[in-house]
């Protein structure tokens, strides 16, 4: 694409292109050092499991026809592997030359692909899309196998009967898989991105964690989707733009208005994972209006950077002053298992230091940490804003209630016709935390009926009561419902595998 909004890897030179092809930004890897057992995990758990779920949805078949899932899996395996092997045999019999070519493609897209991808036993999501060519190749052999069986029968009646059965199989597969793949009413991912963007003040910067809380935002900004609704933009509070920051934002908006067709183009989405790369930092600096003092020479030598012992942050032009400082140890307190700071950690510090007070700055609540700024953030629902006022578990309750009650859309979440996989379920649970915070707030205010209404809304998004522990500890204590408190501790906390962590944190 010409001037893509997000130029992944920015492969504009041969060395950068090779780095992109070799996935250097994800770290060095070796084919010889296996990240998991080749046969047990990479072939068995990953490839064969992915392969199996492409044909007949056993969960749907079990729920609809009451056929045991294990039995259906066995039947499907016999049909799919049997037809494919018959197809391979017939292919070889009819045309050895094309069979050998096809077999080489099958080997490359299965065994060799598994070896090259070297998937770990702790992948963050299913990677079945890596092997889509293998599924298609095997489907061709299945088709040839079906043709072979019809061809081998001598009677016309037998041919017609078998052909009918073989036509029913793909139809049955389509029916069983339809709900899983139907996206006609699925707005969860779109609403996720739109809700994040609409909860931010004008010209905000938001740090996001990974794919799930980044791509939906990019999509909502880049694509003119008629189902994406922009709410009235919240004007910036505690923001004091300078001539430099205003000029940078104006330049960025000229670029973004030209290439983006969606909503909230004023927002800068800064992905923490990509902030480890020089090409992405350049894009934020040059096209997103982010003040960033590292020049190109420094960006080319990122691994020579050293974190300061103290970080001073202040808002230029604020009266009264808005400023705070953080002491930085050699080992990050927010990631004690690692010895040093990541490039992205230093990039976040630099962005906050240079842009604080000039633009609103937020972290998505999905971030694994706030890079040491936890004490200086104030929750507003799905986002936490950086503030100069220190505190523990700070909440802007007015903005939180505004977001969860008036801004966020929750389409598809309670629609049983919309299939939700584990990934979708995890996304949805993030909404629950806002309602829990509202429930705790009203409990502390003595408005117990409101508290119960909000916690009931939280239950729509949170799958187990154990995740409501903080609320029930506060609520039962405030209302002096000691018997219910004891029952919750005995039945919910003490029966949980993490009771040894939860009990000291909330009960003692």
Question: What residue spans do the PLM features occupy?
Answer:
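ER/secretory pathway lumenal C-terminal domains and tails of membrane proteins involved
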Residues: 1-132, 136-203, 214-508
């Amino acid at each position: 694409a010409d001037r893509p909004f997000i130029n992944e890897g920015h492969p504009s030179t041969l060395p950068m292109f090779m780095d992109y092809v070799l996935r250097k930004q994800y770290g060095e890897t070796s084919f010889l050092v296996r990240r998991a057992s080749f046969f047990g995990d990479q072939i068995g758990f990953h490839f064969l499991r992915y392969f199996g779920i492409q044909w007949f949805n056993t969960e749907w078949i079990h729920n609809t026809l009451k056929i045991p899932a294990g039995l259906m899996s066995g039947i499907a395996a016999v049909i799919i592997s049997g037809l494919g092997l018959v197809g391979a045999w017939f292919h070889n019999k009819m045309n050895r030359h094309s069979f050998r070519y096809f077999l080489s493609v099958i080997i490359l897209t299965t065994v060799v692909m598994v070896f090259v991808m070297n998937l770990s036993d702790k992948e963050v999501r299913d990677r079945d899309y890596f092997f889509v060519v293998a599924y298609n190749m095997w489907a061709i052999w299945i088709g040839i196998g079906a043709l072979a069986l019809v061809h081998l029968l001598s009677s016309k009646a037998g041919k017609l009967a078998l052909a009918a059965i073989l036509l029913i199989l793909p139809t049955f597969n389509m029916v069983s898989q339809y709900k899983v793949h139907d996206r006609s009413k699925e707005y969860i991912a779109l609403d996720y991105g739109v809700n994040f963007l609409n909860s931010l003040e004008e010209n905000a910067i938001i740090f996001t964690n990974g794919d799930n809380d980044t791509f939906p935002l990019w999509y909502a900004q880049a694509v003119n989707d008629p189902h994406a609704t922009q709410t009235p933009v919240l004007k910036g509070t505690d923001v004091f733009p300078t001539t430099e920051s205003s000029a940078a934002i104006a330049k960025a908006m000229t670029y973004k208005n030209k290439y983006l067709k969606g909503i909230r183009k004023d927002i800068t989405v800064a992905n923490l994972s990509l902030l480890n790369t020089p090409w992405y930092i350049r894009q934020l600096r040059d096209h997103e209006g982010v003040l960033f003092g590292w020049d190109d020479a420094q960006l080319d030598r990122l691994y020579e950077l050293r974190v300061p012992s103290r970080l001073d942050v202040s808002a230029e032009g604020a009266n009264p002053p808005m400023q705070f400082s953080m002491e930085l140890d050699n080992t990050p307190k927010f990631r004690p298992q690692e010895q040093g700071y990541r490039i992205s950690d230093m990039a976040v510090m630099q962005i906050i230091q240079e842009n604080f007070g000039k633009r609103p700055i937020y972290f998505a609540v999905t971030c694994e940490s706030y890079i040491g700024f936890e004490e200086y953030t104030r929750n507003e629902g799905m986002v936490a804003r950086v503030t100069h006022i220190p505190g523990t578990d700070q909440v802007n309750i007015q903005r939180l209630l505004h977001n969860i009650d008036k801004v966020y859309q929750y389409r598809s979440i309670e629609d049983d016709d919309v299939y939700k996989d584990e990934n979708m379920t995890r996304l949805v649970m993030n909404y629950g935390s806002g309602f829990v915070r509202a429930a705790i707030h009203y409990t502390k205010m003595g408005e117990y009926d409101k508290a119960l209404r909000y916690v009931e809304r939280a239950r729509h998004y949170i799958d187990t009561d154990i995740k409501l522990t903080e609320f029930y500890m506060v609520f039962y204590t405030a209302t002096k419902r000691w018997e219910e408190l004891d029952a919750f501790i005995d039945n919910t906390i003490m029966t949980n595998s993490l009771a040894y962590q939860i009990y000291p944190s909330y009960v003692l």
